[in-house]
């Protein structure tokens, strides 16, 4: 399946998945032809993130507005790990089981920052749910003026105890999402067969990881997230992603005896904190697992965090899986021309339309 340049940079017509000609990108074939089987990827990723089960202990309070019902509360994903949750749902729903969309924020965000999107989804008939990722929002643990997320990642990097290793860079929040689905699936107002997920940037990467492995997620729309960590590292394009947590990378470079952040210490940093990210847990590998469920990948042309050549590898890998499953009608991608790393209004519209179509 050949994905040519013009296809990537041409705006999609409505929500009809892009038609792709036969073949596969040569770069994808060469770099990812020996990817582990989807079953192995799922098994290995689940094992990596496994931790002792705990009671969810959910608690919520409700507030009714003129048009939506808002619930604020929490559940526990681990014995001492409280996950704050924000839920918007249509007032008119009553006791009806609702389709659900989980919305994950990006670096520097929190669940409150997703409220406009939650409201919009609720007005369209969905229950919409956001959480604070690890060390964000109500889960910040650093003193005022510090970046709790970066501090936690730095601490995890410097942790000498391999048995008790945190993974605050993506992986721990992915585990929280799985437990969130555990909780939501028990609610009488949720249709467990109609659960979707979207995320922006960091949240989009977490969406790819969580949804690819968890078959309870029926529809997914990762935004400004499709990429290849392997390609970025090998082609010296890791800087955009690294700058989102730059101080942690600076500390890692210093700890390794380097005067600056470089490819070698970035690789060591990723290897410890997001093991497998340039191999079986890279986006082009994990994205295959979502087929044949409906998937829409939304990227921008000038995104330095998710360089387009790496994104193309992810697109091609997904397309190959969907073609093999005879499900190309359920796969779509779009690249917004001349846009940097941001969720554009047009892509937000496309995301909601995708859920309305498939969920």
Model-derived regions: residue spans:
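Cap/lid segment of the alpha/beta-hydrolase catalytic domain
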Residues: 96, 107-175, 229-236
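Primarily recognizes the serine-hydrolase "nucleophile elbow" in alpha/beta-hydrolase
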Residues: 178-244, 278
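Short beta-strand element of the alpha/beta-hydrolase
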Residues: 85, 96-106
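C-terminal catalytic histidine-bearing segment of alpha/beta-hydrolase fold enzymes
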Residues: 315-359
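Short beta-strand/loop motif that positions the catalytic acidic residue
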Residues: 297-299
